[in-house]
Amino acid sequence: MKPGYHDIYTRYRDNITRGVLKPGDKVPAIRVLAEELKVARKTVETAYAILTGEGYLVSQGARGTRVNPDLLLPDNNAPAEQPTGTLPASLISQRERAGFLRPGIPALDSFPYKKWLLLAGQATRAMRQEEMLNPPVLGWYPLRQAIASYLNISRGLSCTAEQVLITSGYSGSLRLILDTLASRSDKVVFEDPGYFMGQQLLKRIVPRLHTVPVDRCGIDTDYLLRHHRDARFAIITPSHQSPLAVTLSLPRKQQLLDWANQNEAWIIEDDYDGEFHYTRKVLPSLKSLDQHDRVIFMGTFSKTIMPSLRMGYVVMPASTVGAFTDCADITTSGQPVLTQKILTAFLNEGHFFRHLKKMRALYQTRRDWMIAALREVYGDLFFTEQNDGGMHIVAFLTKGSCDREVARCWQEQQLQVNALSEWYRGSGKRYGLVMGYNNVRSYQEALELLERPKRQTLALLN
């Protein structure tokens, strides 16, 4: 029986993790391996794409494809390093490491690679000469139309294609919004805890950055009104807060909208994990409740499709389209038209909706595996709060505050979790591990992964 792409992927992954294939080793060319295994080239392409996406392989152009030279594999016989307090740097570099349980990574084994490759081929063959010039800074218009249609249907927005601006992702969107509308004297508030990479970016570009606590109902709007009523921008994740996974309550949504309208402030709504709710319908966005056009909505395709796509969007309030256009002309160079054409076809032909529906069911199953495995391996050392969706869980420590040390132990075992306390800037910290689960393929695999750092974890927490 001929191997499928998942069989090829599994063989290479296992050989790499066991050390049979070492960092820097060259792997066969796609054509050569396809001929040897007597399978279609697309089968090998798909397997290699998953391995590359997970960081096991790197493509080096004419030099071929190799096992990632920077791959860190666990050495179970090596003595554990002592914590050095440098976890924030490791959180940043984690995005480029291979490993498991990394938050925010979609299920790479379940993406419709063959369909995507087919659309890529069609888009490439259909490229016109004029599309090979500089891309439009606001984005390829058919993609802007497709995104507007998707947001109108699934997120309850009432927007036109003219209000949609295509960006390079989260950082590109946030930079462009602030470059367009903010001055250096403006006060900006951010959730605490809040998205770690967002914090790092804002600390570099916003002189007056302040935080507002988050509780079980989302960002504390009473605190915002007491301490930061004069803020010009509030950056929030109302649908699925990052990282605590709570949903902003309806009374607080209305309170936030009233504040923005009365003070001519802007709310930047980051639709973090907004597509992934498992036990109820996808919630309408905060923007859909906005009667005064004070909400700037932003999202990406990093979690719904793949991180390497580097494609995001901003829904501009109608009154700001001119300002955004002028700023984008100066500060951005547009996104590749070919990639935008592939994504447009993926949306317009219904593949995106079908993929999301499949992923919601799959992620709910994999989340349940991870929570059950965590309980079986660690008993009551961790606890989780049942939330309705998202792409990660927070395993809170039941005692102690050494989540940095625990996270470091797990990272040494190739488990790329985050320490929750690193996502806080103010007081009132909670302690635990932020972990992804989307690429855990079975309950048994979840158990095996969690067993890796068990000895060191028990030593720290008991």
List where the protein language model places each region.
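N-terminal basic, amphipathic alpha-helical segments
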Residues: 1-123, 319, 325, 329-336, ...
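Helix-loop "lid/cap" segments that line or gate small-molecule binding pockets
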Residues: 147, 313, 341-349
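Active-site PLP attachment segment
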Residues: 62, 288-323
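Conserved core of the PLP fold type I
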Residues: 130-263, 274-276, 281-289, 293, ...
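Hydrophobic residues at beta-strand termini and immediately following loops
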Residues: 101, 167, 212, 298, ...
